[in-house]
Design a protein with these regions (language model features):
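Coiled-coil-like amphipathic alpha-helices with heptad-repeat character
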Residues: 22, 47, 98-103, 238
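A short linear-motif detector with a strong N-terminal bias
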Residues: 47-50, 114, 121, 170-172
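Small/flexible residues
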Residues: 29, 54, 71, 105-110, ...
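A generic alpha-helix propensity feature with a strong bias for hydrophobic helices
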Residues: 54, 92, 132, 240-242, ...
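Long, intrinsically disordered, low-complexity segments
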Residues: 1-39, 121, 126, 152, ...
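C-terminal substrate/ligand-recognition segments
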Residues: 59, 63-158
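An aromatic- and glycine-enriched ligand-binding surface/loop that stacks and positions planar moieties
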Residues: 1-89
Length: 255
């Protein structure tokens, strides 16, 4: 959903990095790491882009609270504690409901260079697109083209890898659910909701209340007056630079 993720400023090497990557990960400076977590997880990153309870609930509904894919994707606070991660007393993670993504944790073994001396950074490769996304796109295309058997094969290849029971038939709703779970935090959800025509309902209250997670639990400290998906969000705004270069380009409605 973020348009400006990369600054290509050749004169400032500091500017040539991905803003989204900085926001991902855990707020490790506010945490204590013990045991397995201390051995595996690199320090750094800011702790934004955390999963909502609604995503956790969707996983539980689809595969149970002990689902293999759920355990590899996100953890609740009790599971984080069992892994060896504790939020320090007096610290908090803004925009968090007590769930953290596990799939994007930065492992020491993946680090090109340890940059834990500065909280924002870690040097590790990011996945831009996975084979699972290709399969899900193919499944949707085949289903809409009248090839449900091929679509079923595509989606079950993902489910088998995730140790889920294969489906015996497939619908568009099956593909929507599978894509939400398999590709969460991989920059596909917003665009999918828009093109499916589901965004207005699915994102109706998005951004209304902002959670804050601390060692005392979850509190709701702020409520926005403007929130949710609006008609203008069907299209992204046209950048000012493009409109300056071509005055004939009109800004999209609402922006």
């Amino acid at each position: 959903m973020l348009e400006l993720q990369w600054r290509n400023d050749q004169e400032q090497a500091w500017s040539q990095w991905d803003f989204t990557f900085v926001m991902q990960g855990w707020r490790t400076g506010n945490m204590t790491f013990e045991g397995k977590a201390a051995d595996e997880v690199a320090q750094g990153t800011y702790g934004f882009l955390n999963p909502r309870k609604s995503l956790y609930d969707a996983f539980v509904k689809a595969e149970g609270k002990n689902g293999y894919r759920l355990q590899k994707t996100l953890l609740n606070s009790d599971q984080m504690t069992a892994y060896g991660v504790k939020l320090n007393p007096g610290q908090n993670i803004y925009g968090c409901e007590g769930y953290l993504f596990f799939k994007n944790r930065i492992l020491k073994s993946d680090n090109i260079m340890d940059a834990s001396f500065f909280q924002a950074l870690q040097y590790t490769d990011r996945k831009i697109m996975r084979y699972a996304e290709v399969l899900l796109l193919a499944a949707e295309a085949n289903l809409e083209a009248g090839n449900p058997d091929v679509a079923l094969k595509d989606i079950n290849e993902i489910r088998l890898r995730a140790k889920e029971t294969p489906l015996t038939s497939v619908t568009l709703n099956d593909i929507k659910t599978e894509k939400r779970l398999e590709l969460c935090l991989e920059s596909t959800r917003f665009q999918d909701l828009v093109r499916w025509g589901d965004a207005k309902n699915a994102l109706a209250s998005q951004g209304k209340e902002i959670p804050n997670y601390s060692s005392k639990g979850v509190s709701w400290d702020f409520t926005n007056s403007t929130f949710g998906f609006q008609d203008k969000h069907m299209l992204l705004p046209i950048p000012l630079k493009e409109r300056e270069l071509n005055p004939n380009i009109q800004q999209n409605t609402g922006w």
